[in-house]
Amino acid sequence: MRPSRRAPDELRAVSLERGVVKYAEGSCMVKFGDTHVLVTATLEERLPPWLKGQGRGWVTAEYGMLPRATLERTRREASAGKQGGRTVEIQRLIGRSLRAAVDLEALGERQITVDCDVIQADGGTRTASITGAWVALADCIGWMKARNMIKTSVLRDNVAAVSCGIYNGTPVLDLDYAEDSEADTDANFVMTGDGRIIEVQGTAEKTPFSQDEFLALLALAKKGVARLVDLQKMAVA
């Protein structure tokens, strides 16, 4: 039995609310159960120096957690003077994931910066961030289309992410913190709307896992991502 009493293939309650920030070109409040992330997408008419003059744009991301997003206060990274390794890893993952779904040439010589701020963390902050980031990105691109800044399709596909793991010997979908902290194995899957894989991160926390167990996790992830993509489509409709 899962602590949340969910079925092995059941997502947490997921919501994606678009257009929640007044000033941002795109925004989304994403909730995976008790994990809540505020995502904004900002259009900038500038590029990294190494991209200038190449006729294509860029999508990048930043990620952070509020001090009391967790059970005990976490010191702000700004006050420590540098970002932690986990933060850098996650924001690079978010950026890579979004770029996989964007036609950067159609975007033109512009940059979209996606900011993911974790308000409350209960496991799966990176997967929630990616799923909400796609909605904020789509919101931003819609803003651009409405102003005739782009004429062709920029988004090639949806992108969503979900965690899976082996908890008490059973493959389960969308781990919360109680499960993640006790799981034998946990993995994050980032996938497109048509089921292609962008990235997989998997770790045996206690005991190594078999190929059959990995395939079971992959099957769960495909099911979970398909449901998340449906929710994304409803959010941006």
UniProtKB/Swiss-Prot annotation:
Alphabetized, the UniProt keywords read: Nucleotidyltransferase, RNA-binding, rRNA processing, Transferase, tRNA processing, tRNA-binding
Enumerate the catalysed reactions.
tRNA(n+1) + phosphate = tRNA(n) + a ribonucleoside 5'-diphosphate
Q: Where does phosphate bind?
A: R86, G124, T125, R126
Q: Pfam families in the record, alphabetically?
A: RNase_PH, RNase_PH_C
Q: Which CDD domains match?
A: RNase_PH_bact
Alphabetical GO biological process terms: rRNA catabolic process; rRNA processing; tRNA processing
- Per the UniProt entry, the Enzyme Commission number(s) are 2.7.7.56
On whether RNA-binding is a keyword of this UniProt record, the answer is yes
Entry GO MF terms? 3'-5'-RNA exonuclease activity; tRNA binding; tRNA nucleotidyltransferase activity
What superkingdom does the record give? Bacteria
Give the InterPro entries listed for this entry.
ExoRNase_PH_dom1 (IPR001247), ExoRNase_PH_dom2 (IPR015847), ExoRNase_PH_dom2_sf (IPR036345), PNPase/RNase_PH_dom_sf (IPR027408), Ribosomal_Su5_D2-typ_SF (IPR020568), RNase_PH (IPR050080), RNase_PH_bac-type (IPR002381), RNase_PH_CS (IPR018336)
Question: What is the annotated quaternary arrangement, including any partners?
Answer: Homohexameric ring arranged as a trimer of dimers.
Known function: Phosphorolytic 3'-5' exoribonuclease that plays an important role in tRNA 3'-end maturation. Removes nucleotide residues following the 3'-CCA terminus of tRNAs; can also add nucleotides to the ends of RNA molecules by using nucleoside diphosphates as substrates, but this may not be physiologically important. Probably plays a role in initiation of 16S rRNA degradation (leading to ribosome degradation) during starvation.
| UniProt family annotation | Belongs to the RNase PH family.
Q: What is this protein called?
A: Ribonuclease PH
What gene is behind this protein? rph
